[in-house]
């Protein structure tokens, strides 16, 4: 049994200090720093997420209340509220973006080889979620007269359901603006909703050998080139090869696409799907789109389990720092979930971990059997050294 450091300390050991300090040097994170290091800031913000703190007072007070256990975290003392606030406002949020990608690589190393679909293509979902902000406090985020918002754009890799890319923008930035900046490897399958309609971009993806699956918009003008046979007893109403009728900046559309119509029994309605993959079966296309709910589940976990609704700073830098540390915390939970044999749900793991942060127990034995009591301490007399007297 580990009697010398807390579970929180063992979690922090998953972020090697040498690698962290290399990132600090890379981003010049401690330029003009006076005692309060980037590691101190990272520990405080990770405690905010895992401990459920909702304000600077709760972060600093919570750490101060465990003063005797801070040395195992690599922290000399609990920060002052003004010190942490200043660091969140001025230190580069890009540091925590790099920490996020380092942890993502560690998570990918423990993901198994089993896949849900038979095809070998890399499958990713693309979507965004809005975080409502008070326009009077976050004036830089205003996109309507009385409303402010920030957006988190995400690529979710379906192999392990891990985020592979994230981008934080203001509420004015449209989803397709961010999507145009992504670079996908040939053969990648991108699943997205109807917010990503751009004929030229679709054609460019097809030319690059990138496949996509999305919902078909009813106002999408097209002509049917071929009607394909539909499978029996699969609720597929139509499988068509189509060509878009719109004239775009690149000229007339010559690329062929597929339009697949599915009858949804539960809702008693038709759903139409759109893809540039001409060889898959119709049921494969619909199943791939159905798996897109995983990215919705990821966003739901971020908003429900972590602190992204109340913020401890109002500047763009402070907000991005808090969102990136929230993504790091969720990725950390995913890593623990992958390493554990217990079968945790993310919500249950987050709730119990919050109660155990400063408990002195071995992390992974606890993860694998959380309700097993820790090994009993050996009897004091058994552990006491004996002093033998020699006859003289």
What are these regions (language model features)?
Residues 73-90:
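Major-groove recognition helix of helix-turn-helix-like DNA-binding domains
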Residues 1-58, 62, 91, 98-101, ...:
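Single, function-defining residue in the core of a domain
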């Amino acid at each position: 049994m580990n009697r010398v450091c807390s579970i929180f300390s063992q979690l922090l050991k998953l972020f090697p200090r040498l690698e962290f300090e290399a990132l600090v040097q890379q981003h010049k994170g401690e330029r003009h720093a006076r005692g309060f290091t980037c590691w101190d800031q990272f520990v405080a913000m990770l405690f905010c997420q895992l401990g459920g703190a909702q304000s600077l007072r709760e972060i600093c007070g919570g750490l101060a209340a465990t003063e005797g256990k801070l040395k195992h975290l690599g922290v000399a003392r609990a920060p002052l509220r003004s010190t942490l606030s200043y660091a969140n406002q001025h230190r580069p949020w890009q540091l925590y973006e790099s920490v996020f990608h380092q942890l993502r690589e560690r998570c990918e190393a423990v993901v198994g080889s089993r896949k849900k679909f038979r095809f070998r293509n890399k499958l990713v979902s693309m979507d965004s979620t809005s975080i409502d902000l008070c326009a009077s406090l976050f004036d830089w985020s205003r996109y309507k007269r009385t409303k402010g918002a920030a957006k988190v754009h995400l690529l979710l890799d379906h192999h392990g359901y891990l985020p592979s890319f994230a981008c934080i923008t203001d509420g004015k930035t449209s989803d397709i603006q961010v999507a145009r900046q992504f670079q996908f490897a040939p053969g990648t399958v991108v699943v997205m909703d109807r917010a990503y309609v751009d004929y030229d971009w679709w054609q460019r993806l097809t030319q690059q050998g990138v496949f996509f699956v999305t919902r078909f918009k009813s106002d999408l003008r097209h002509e049917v080139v071929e009607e394909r046979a539909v499978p029996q007893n699969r609720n597929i109403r139509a499988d068509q090869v189509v060509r878009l009728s719109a004239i775009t900046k690149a000229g007339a559309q010559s690329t062929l696409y597929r339009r697949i119509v599915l009858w949804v029994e539960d809702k008693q309605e038709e759903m139409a799907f759109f893809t540039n993959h001409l060889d898959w079966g119709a049921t494969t296309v619909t199943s791939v789109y159905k798996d897109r709910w995983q990215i919705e589940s990821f966003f739901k976990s971020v908003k429900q389990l972590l602190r992204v609704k109340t913020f401890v700073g109002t500047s763009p830098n402070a907000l991005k720092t808090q969102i990136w540390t929230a993504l790091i915390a969720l990725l950390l939970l995913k890593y623990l979930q992958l390493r554990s044999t217990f079968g945790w749900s993310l919500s249950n793991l987050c709730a119990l971990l919050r109660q155990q942060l400063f408990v002195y127990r071995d992390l992974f034995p606890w993860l694998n059997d959380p309700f097993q009591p820790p090994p009993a301490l050996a009897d004091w007399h058994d552990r006491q050294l004996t002093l033998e007297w020699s006859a003289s």
